[in-house]
């Protein structure tokens, strides 16, 4: 691993080995605080592969090594507010369904943001249609936050959807993009917004999902050297600039030249403790090793193995559900969103959907799965997904469990259908509207 890295990055062997050995001991604070010199170069190359796809963007991303995607979210929100890029009362757009904390953080008193929902449509294979993307043309929307591939629906942006966003940026070059791409490595050839629109994008990544290392707390914040964040700060009125001068004046004699990425570092330790900022040194060594392992695997055997596991479990769940699904090249197989309303409408009809909404509480599904089958799933409503949906994770359980999940979900759906038919019969409509056996 060490000889490969020395050759690949033209490292001085002694300096690289010293960084590894000195850091694994963990006897002092990170220097530089944002990220170790060799680690940043290695992680930069890893992110180019994992996030940017082809063609790679020109120039360099500056990276801040952080304690997982969670810390990346917290630090980013805090610095956007501290630097008056997003202010209380401002409006952002959220690509929904989305990881629940993005919905919750916007409402916190700390930020007090309004948000517009940009909906990925299930009937459009969870891509954002043109009419939804056009909402971003509204000048009051300052930023678009997105998880790509999605959580809970597990679909990456298609080339067509990325183009739609690009069309918006041509008219709104001031629009901030924040993309959380934790699941990108589960889609071969994945293309992040930070690869397509580096100037407008702040990229968040975590190693936790792909390497199964949640407990290590390894994540990154990446901002291109040519970015609109620094430009927005530079255009602040003099009154705000003076306030920011005071905030960051203890760090440098020229605080107005301090890049946004370095302000994030300082803000992560409330500025006053900036000298203690940064991801712990042993964690950074682990980040180096994970990144090098993937870069050295030119045949992508590890990626294929990970995808193979998830695909096998997905297939078992689908078999248990006894449904047929078409292929989707942008599906990452990490999660699956099972929407009872969508499938009831597709296989039975609109009448049973109306009956469900009148007679079944959306949480009934997850409670019955837990009480009757010992299966614990998250309800989709918490992600701003359809109310009668549940999220299945294909990364956590033994293979044999997934066909059980499929059969249990199907049994609950069958129970709803039987209750629906019983109500029809009770009202004298059973013979007329009984569900055909082929649709059961």
Locate predicted features:
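Walker B catalytic acidic pair
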Residues: 180-181
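Active-site PLP attachment segment
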Residues: 2, 194-259, 391
């Amino acid at each position: 691993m060490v000889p490969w890295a020395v050759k690949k990055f033209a490292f001085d062997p002694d300096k690289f080995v010293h960084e590894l050995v000195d850091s694994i001991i963990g006897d002092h604070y990170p220097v530089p605080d944002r990220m170790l010199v060799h680690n940043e170069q290695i992680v930069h190359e890893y992110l180019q592969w994992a996030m940017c796809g082809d063609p790679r963007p020109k120039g360099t991303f500056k990276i801040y090594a952080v304690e997982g995607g969670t810390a990346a979210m917290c630090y980013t929100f805090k610095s956007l507010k501290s630097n008056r890029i997003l202010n209380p009362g401002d409006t952002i757009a959220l690509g929904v369904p989305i990881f629940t904390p993005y919905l919750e953080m916007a409402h916190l008193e700390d930020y007090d943001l309004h948000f517009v929902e940009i909906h990925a449509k299930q009937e459009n294979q969870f891509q954002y249609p043109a009419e939804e993307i056009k909402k971003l043309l509204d000048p009051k929307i300052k930023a678009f936050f997105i998880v790509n591939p999605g959580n809970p629906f597990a679909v990456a942006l298609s080339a067509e959807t990325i183009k739609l966003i690009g069309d918006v940026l041509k008219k709104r070059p001031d629009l901030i993009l924040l993309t959380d791409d934790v699941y990108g490595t589960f889609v071969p050839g994945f293309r992040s917004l930070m690869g397509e629109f580096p100037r407008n994008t702040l990229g968040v990544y975590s190693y936790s999902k792909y390497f199964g290392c949640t407990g290590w707390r390894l994540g990154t914040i990446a901002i291109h050297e040519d970015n609109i964040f620094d430009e927005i700060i530079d255009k602040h009125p003099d009154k705000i600039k003076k306030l920011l001068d005071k905030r960051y004046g203890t760090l440098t004699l020229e605080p107005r030249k301090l890049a946004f990425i370095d302000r994030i570092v300082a803000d992560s330790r409330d500025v006053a403790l900036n000298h203690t900022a940064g991801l712990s040194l042993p964690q950074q060594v682990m980040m180096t090793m994970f990144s090098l392992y993937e870069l050295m695997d030119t045949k992508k055997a590890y990626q294929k193995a990970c995808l193979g596991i998830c695909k096998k479990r997905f297939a078992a769940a689908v078999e248990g559900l006894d449904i047929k699904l078409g292929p989707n090249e942008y599906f990452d197989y990490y999660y699956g969103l099972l929407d009872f309303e969508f499938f009831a409408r597709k296989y039975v009809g609109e009448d049973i959907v109306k009956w469900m909404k009148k007679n079944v509480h959306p949480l009934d599904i997850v409670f019955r799965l837990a009480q009757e089958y010992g299966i614990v799933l998250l309800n989709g409503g918490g992600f701003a997904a359809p109310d009668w949906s549940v999220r299945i994770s294909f990364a956590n359980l033994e293979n044999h469990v997934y066909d059980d999940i499929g059969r249990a979900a199907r049994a609950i759906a069958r129970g709803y259908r039987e209750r629906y038919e019983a109500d029809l019969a009770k009202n004298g409509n059973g013979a007329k509207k009984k569900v055909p056996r082929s649709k059961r």
